[in-house]
Amino acid sequence: MTELPTVENLINGEWLRSDHERTVHHKFTGAPLATSYDATPAMVTNAVTVARAASRTPLNPLQRYEILRGVADQIAANREELALDVARESGFSIKDCLGDTDRAVQTMLTSAEEAKRIDGEVVPIQAAPGFAHRLAFTIRTPVGVVGAITPFNSPLNTVAHKVGPALAAGNAVIVKPSPFTPIAAAALCRMLLDAGLPPGLIGLVLGPGDPVGQALVDDERVDFITFTGSTAAGKAISARLGMRRATMECGNVSATIVCQDADVLSAAQQCARGAFRKSGQVCTSVQRLYIHADILDEFLDELSAAASKLVLGDPEDPSTDIGPMISEAAAKRAEEWVHAAVDQGARIVTGGDRQGPVMTPTILVDVAPDARLLCEEAFAPVVSVVPFNDLEAVIDKVNDTPYGLQAGIFTRDLDTALTAAKTLRMGGVVINSTSSTRADLMPYGGVKDSGYGTEGPRYAIRDMTEERLILMEPAGGSK
C-alpha cells in the first residue's frame, strides 16, 4: 500500500506531527489524498511563543516586498500543480482552481507592493494654541502576532489574503486552515520559507476550530485575529477576544437585482455563474434573485438555459464546470432546504437533484418569504427567483436580512444605479454585475452580521497595523 503524503504543523521552521491524524479526501472520488496531523494545545502555545519572539524584530519593508514577490513567482511557476491540489481537496473545478491560483499570485504581488507604501501623515499641530513650535506626525506599526483562520472554499487565495497583508505589515502570522483543505495552506507556508522568510514569522497549526482554532483565539499573546467563515463562528470568536482587534468576514444571503431595462441575456449568464460557481459555496454567491416582473419569464428562460449548459463531474476534468460540494452532509442539507421550500409552496424550475456530494444547479420560484432559502445562507448551488415591480420596495427586501456583505444590480439607468448604491446597506454594491464579483485589490468586507474589518491587501494592512502619534518639541523647549 502506497503511503499517503503528509500535511504537518509548522512551528519555527520545523514540520511537526502529532498523535492525532486525519485523512484528507478527494471530494469527488472519496479517495484519500493525504494524512494531516492536528495540532495539540501545547503546539499552539509553542507556535504563539515563537511568533511572539519573532515579531519583536520585524523585517524592513524592502525585505517584506522581496519575500512576498518571491512567493508570487513561486505560485505562478507551480500554477498547474497547485490548482490540481486545490481541485482535489476542495472539489472545485480545475477551471475555478486555476483562476484562484492566478488570483493568489495577484494577492501576493499586491501585498508585496503595499509593503512599500505603509505611510503616516503630518498632523497640523502648530495650529493648536501653545503648540506653535512643535511637530507631530503619525506612523503605522505592526500589531505583532496575527492569527489567521481560513475556510475550505478558497484554500489558497484566502490564505494569501490573510498571510500576505499580515507579513507586508511587519507581523508574524499563524495560519489555521480548514481541516477539509490543509494542503494548499501548507504549500504556501513552504513557499514563504523557500523565499527567505525567517521561520518564526510563519506558523501553521492544523485541525478543527475546537480545539485548535479556539486555542489560537484564546491566547492573549495573539494580537489580531483575521477570520473568514460562518457568522455563528465569527460571533463566537468575537465574544472571546475582549479588547483585542479582529477582521471578521462572515456569511451573507447574497442578492442581485435585475431591473426592467437590463440586458437580460448578459444578466442571466452572469447570475448563473455567480450562483453556481464552486457549487454556490462562496460568501457572495447569488442566492436571492429579484427580477422585474416585466422580464421575469424571459430571464427565467435564459437563466435555465445557462444552468443547463453547466457540466457537472470530476473537478479534475477540464470540461467540468461544477464539482461536488465539500461533503455529502453539506449536499444533503442543501437538498433538505430545497424540499422544505417546496413543501412551503415553492416550485423547482430546474435542478433539485443530488447524487452523493454533487448537487445539481437548482432554480426555484414562488419561494415563501420565510423559507430558509431566502433567510439563511444556503452555501449551495441553489438560487431563488422573486419578481418585483417597485425599486424602493425591492431594496427594502434586499436589506431585510441580518447580513450585509455585497449585493448586485443590473440596470442601464444611472439614477437607479446610484439609488441602489446609496440605499443598499452592504459592504459593497456591484453595478451591472452580480454580488459575487470581486477583484483582490479592492476593499472587501461586510456590515451587520456579515462582519467587520476589510480585506484587500491595502485595507487589511491598515487593520493589521496600529497608528501611533509622534509629538516633538524642540530640545530647548518652546521659544
Model-found features: residue ranges?
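Hydrophobic face of amphipathic alpha-helices that form TPR/SEL1-like repeat modules
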Residues: M1-K27, P32, P124
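Residue-level signal for inorganic ion chemistry
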Residues: G30, R64, V86, M108, ...
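Glycine-rich loop-to-alpha-helix module at the N-terminal edge of alpha/beta enzyme cores
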Residues: G30-D119
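Conserved C-terminal structural/oligomerization subdomain of aldehyde/semialdehyde dehydrogenase
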Residues: A31-T35, R221-V222, I257, V311, ...
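Short, well-ordered beta-strand elements within core beta-sheets of diverse protein domains
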Residues: P32-A39, R52-T57, G147-A148, T256-C259, ...
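Rossmann-like NAD(P) dinucleotide-binding subdomain of oxidoreductase/dehydrogenase enzymes
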Residues: V123-S266, F388
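A short hydrophobic/small-residue beta-strand
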Residues: A172-I174, I348, G428
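ALDH superfamily catalytic-core signature
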Residues: F224, A232-A368, E392, I431, ...
